[in-house]
Amino acid sequence: MVLEMLNPMHFNITTMVPAAMPAATMPILLLTCLLLLIWNYEGTSSIPGPGYCMGIGPLISYARFLWMGIGSACNYYNKMYGEFIRVWICGEETLIISKSSSMFHVMKHSHYVSRFGSKPGLQCIGMHENGIIFNNNPALWKVVRPFFMKALTGPGLVQMVAICVGSIGRHLDKLEEVTTRSGCVDVLTLMRRIMLDTSNTLFLGIPMDESAIVVKIQGYFDAWQALLLKPNIFFKISWLYKKYEKSVKDLKDAIDILVEKKRRRISTAEKLEDHMDFATNLIFAEKRGDLTRENVNQCVLEMLIAAPDTMSVSVFFMLFLIAKHPSVEEAIMEEIQTVVGERDIRIDDIQKLKVVENFIYESMRYQPVVDLVMRKALEDDVIDGYPVKKGTNIILNIGRMHRLEFFPKPNEFTLENFAKNVPYRYFQPFGFGPRGCAGKYIAMVMMKVILVTLLRRFQVKALQGRSVENIQKKNDLSLHPDETSDLLEMIFTPRNSDTCLGQ
């Protein structure tokens, strides 16, 4: 009998199953599928967004983030489904929020201080439970944050003004180093060098090959952006990620050498009072056992890359906006002449530069660089009536919020948008609360110093009708110009002179 059943020539399928399926079978199967869909959708069905569809929805939404980039995908889903929606990233529920009341709730509460991202990706770039920017271990993050806050406020803020003025002057005096063959100025490289030089002088104080480090920082940022959301399987195929691994190693090795030089300088210094900067405080904490050597090196790396990575692009966009809006330039120049005159800018001038401040705010609103914030819920919560489970990923789409609420002309670049006081819940370029940007005050001061010092010496012009609106951009972890495209340089014309750089 057994042999007959195993022999296909003798096996009769009709003896094993009924000739016809019972009439109730099909409805039962359909009901089972429906119950599975409901079970998979349970708890999140009240939140708008793409459907689960037996796992197809999460795959499609994750693929869209990998394909479009984080920023572009967020804008796509908010436009498609609304200002509070649910998607999936790497199989994890993720909320994308561009509603001011919901953002305010997330930013102000301490159970949203954690970040999220691919663990092997963050390990590769050195940010997994390390540093401050994407450290997703709240306990360790709280240990290092005070070092950043101390360096970025108080005396450090005051010292930065003179240091930055000096750096700008030196770099403008050798502008030919960032001038193309056609005579145009590579503004991004110029800004990155100025900001790296200023940061190094203020926070580390070790001579470096500025141009080489700037290139390494860009490689590191490209790796960070590329690896942040990659699936685990990506890191099991070495040829896929080895170029990013090399870019990270290049910068980390360079920073390790600089920090080691700092250690030797401290050990031979007669008076430590002259060297009590950010890096010195970290090294002392390492000697006390509060930090590891890896912690120290990563914190120094993140402090040095912050301004060249994002602020340089912000100033780049600002200069293009000034070139397009001569009335704004005129108002800025009148204020500079009134407040600063012919001398260098000082710390007591900063609060008086209201037109410059409003221009910076409107530039960051209209053309943001960091237009999203990534968080993770550390406990169950309810946001604007929607249940949020512990472990849920959250992306705050700040750039979109700045164009949806409060401002009288949200889709135009105009200083009228800041003619009246703007409640801070509607304008959050740096975030706020326990995980707000530690460098927001020093960033504002540095941008004012750079704009005032540069515009006093040069008038800036874009090439061939180029403007912020028609520059090709990439919107992923942050919004950057596509540096593979042409015509990103500018014309610098010395004021009160007939000579011109770029013509």
From Swiss-Prot:
Q: Which GO terms describe its biological process?
A: female gonad development; lipid metabolic process; response to estradiol
* SUPFAM superfamilies hit by this protein: Cytochrome P450
The principal localisation class reads membrane
- Check the record and name the PROSITE patterns matching this protein: CYTOCHROME_P450
> Sorted alphabetically, which Gene3D superfamilies does this protein's record hold?
Cytochrome P450 (1.10.630.10)
Subcellular localization, per the record? Membrane
Q: Where does heme bind?
A: 437
Molecular-function annotations in GO: aromatase activity; heme binding; iron ion binding
Q: Does the keyword Manganese apply?
A: no
Reactions catalysed, as given in the entry: testosterone + 3 reduced [NADPH--hemoprotein reductase] + 3 O2 = 17beta-estradiol + formate + 3 oxidized [NADPH--hemoprotein reductase] + 4 H2O + 4 H(+); androst-4-ene-3,17-dione + 3 reduced [NADPH--hemoprotein reductase] + 3 O2 = estrone + formate + 3 oxidized [NADPH--hemoprotein reductase] + 4 H2O + 4 H(+)
EC number from the UniProt entry? 1.14.14.14
The record's keywords, sorted A to Z, are: Heme, Iron, Lipid metabolism, Membrane, Metal-binding, Monooxygenase, Oxidoreductase
Give the Pfam families listed for this entry. Answer: p450
What is the recorded membrane topology of this protein?
Peripheral membrane protein
Q: Which InterPro entries match?
A: Cyt_P450, Cyt_P450_CS, Cyt_P450_E_grp-I, Cyt_P450_sf, Cytochrome_P450_Monoox
Report whether Membrane shows up as a keyword of the record.
yes
This protein's GO CC annotations: endoplasmic reticulum; membrane
Q: Which cofactor does it need?
A: heme
Family recorded in the similarity comment: Belongs to the cytochrome P450 family.
Main function? Catalyzes the formation of aromatic C18 estrogens from C19 androgens.
Specify the protein name.
Aromatase
Which species is the source of this protein? Oryctolagus cuniculus (Rabbit)
